[in-house]
Amino acid sequence: MAGGEKYERPAIAGSGTIATGLAACASVASKVLLLARSDASAWKAEEQAHSLAAKIDGGDAKRIKVTTQAGDLAECDLVVEAIVEELGPKVDLLQTVGDAAADADLATTTSSLSLDELASQSGHAGRVFGLHPFNPVVKMDLIELCLPDATNDEIRPRARTWCEAIGKTVVEVPNEPGFVVNRLLFPYLFDAVRLMEQTGMGAEEVDSCMTLGANYPMGPLALLDLIGVDVAVAIGEALHADSGEDHHRPPGRLIALVDAGKLGRKSGAGFYEYD
């Protein structure tokens, strides 16, 4: 396990929106290594992380280094897995980075998959814990922290210190699927989609009701586009598999959007069209 009171050599494993946002935030506190799976994804991730770092007070693009080699993580004391919300790929990555960075604490950004399964199947139980940020990472203040029973208690203060150092507010949450935010949020989002299915209302009409009537900063359909429709489906499927409750089941319209490649903002189309 990592020693000391704080992380000095963090790494982020992933090249998507959450990974690059975390890398940008981490650059406020120290150098950070970003692990991508291919040269093409590494180039895109570096460009995105550098761009985001420039938008953060104290962010420093020069502190962000990108690699495609897991062996480069050998000296890291924290590795944060931030890839697709699927058990198999996350387990494989945690196993790989845990072997490569033998002394590092291992965080996962999941909120819907079982931390206990991720820890046990990766072979690194005791080192794995949950750090769940929110999209867009550079703007959202919260990180949910979750330590399974098997996780070394010494990780807790290190994790809190790091999150605060990169400008986030930490709330420790129970080891339950969805933690707090997604457990409350996704039934609401899915109900908005079902309302469209049942009534024929448009996305703008539903969103306007919530932004103007409930003073929400963003409507549920626009928020689904921001989260990523595919990510929302994956989270819903994981929540439903655990609870069996209908309000966790992704609506058919969401699944149809994924099948059509309409994943929200990142693909240029979802419930709305984007330039």
Across the structure, where does each feature detected by a protein language model lie?
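NAD(P)-dependent Rossmann-like dehydrogenase/reductase catalytic/cofactor-binding core
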Residues: 2-6, 30, 37, 164-169, ...
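Rossmann-like NAD(P)-binding element
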Residues: 37-41, 54-105
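Short glycine/serine/threonine-rich phosphate/pyrophosphate-binding segments
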Residues: 18-22, 88-90, 111-115
